């Protein structure tokens, strides 16, 4: 009996030791800091999912090549485990569970879109896993009291409210009429709320308030009404596919409005895809290469854009740039925390 107890105690000790080792190595394997990310590589958000992944990879390569992350007197390099969330919120939540519970990831990068970020945030919060996200701009993400969710971008309600202000300014300070068409996702609905606030603030009038179809492939019904009612401003938000559909059908149906304000113009590569038909669209953006901000890793926007194009073969949209910024934020937080303890890293992120 005593021998059995000794054997049982020895086995239990091995189990505890093994479990502790797995937990430790999950966050740092040798000299690598393992981050997890569920990204839309297929489905309706796939183009922006690729932009997001490319931005992450660009920053990982740059940080690693410039000395990595210094914690506790040692140097570490970033690595990322990716899974395809298929542009599906349920799948994104499942993959977050997998990354944390099975792969042992203790630090997460966000997905693309507010809807998928909204699906993942409760999972990372439950496990106390810090997540830095770069592409979930919905205001509702930041009103739920999450303590482990951090973002590098401005909220969606600030994307196109300035378009209404500009239209009023160009109308000699007089109110304008506004037509709107929005996707039924968290991001676009927050953009809509910002536009509605601007309409109210300026005394302007909403004359069309339509929902874009789920597949974002046809907005002819809205455009027929626009031709009939002749609003001063047409506002559209439907991610990349919605932007492409809008420009294509506006040209096909010969719709003419004094101002067209949209989201996702650069991600959709409108100027390349639709040429002159995309000219004069007023487009919201979180970043542009001509901005004068500088840092020690990418120098400035023009240099970042040139390096990105050399690596991936196209001019970076803001989704890529803000994704790169998420890695810089994580590096800074790890080094200020001087630890891989999740709570300490979380506190460092909160102080950023």
At which residue positions do the language-model features occur?
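Hydrophobic alpha-helical
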Residues: 114-121, 125, 231-253, 326-327
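Extracellular/periplasmic bilobal clamshell ligand-binding domains
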Residues: 224, 230, 328-352
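Beta-alpha junction/loop-to-helix N-cap segments that form part of ligand/metal-binding clefts
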Residues: 27-28, 34, 47-54, 66-143, ...
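Short, low-complexity disordered leader/linker segments with a strong preference
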Residues: 1-34
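Extracellular/periplasmic periplasmic-binding protein-like sensory domains
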Residues: 250-324, 335-336, 340
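Extracytoplasmic "Venus flytrap"
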Residues: 29, 36-57, 83-89, 112-113, ...
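Extracytoplasmic ligand/sensor domains, especially the bilobed periplasmic-binding protein
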Residues: 54, 90, 105-209, 258-283
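Surface-exposed patches in mature extracellular/periplasmic domains of secreted proteins
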Residues: 68-73, 77-78, 177-180, 315-321, ...
